[in-house]
Amino acid sequence: MKSRFHEAADAELTEAVAYYDGKAAGLGDRFLVDVKAATRYIERYPEIASVIDREVRAKVLTRFPYSLMYVVEPHQLFIVAVAHQSRRPGYWVNRVPERSGG
């Protein structure tokens, strides 16, 4: 299964990479590697992560205090947020697509 990032989630990813690059050389790259590994994992096992709100699942990153918040759609995963675990919970909820008939 493939994935796509919400525009705001993509911006969060870019911001986090820049933040970690500012902390230490190469740290942003390590963050990106962790995000890519988590993305590949949920593409392979889309229902592995727990549902935390409606249909949204959270895949916690291995080495950083972030989670990928995503929805399993019929033919893809839709990543709605690259959320820092200390950030206001549910700030991304308005990014979740509406489901018809449910």
Q: What spans do the regions from the language model cover?
A:
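Short, hydrophobic secondary-structure boundary micro-motifs
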Residues: 29, 50-52, 91
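Conserved amphipathic alpha-helical interaction elements at protein-protein interfaces in regulatory
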Residues: 15, 19-22, 41-44, 48, ...
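A short, surface-exposed loop/turn module that caps and links secondary-structure elements
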Residues: 37-62
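Enriched for short, Lys/Arg-rich terminal
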Residues: 67, 71-102
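Arg/Lys-rich, positively charged N-terminal/basic patches that mediate binding to nucleic acids
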Residues: 1-32, 102
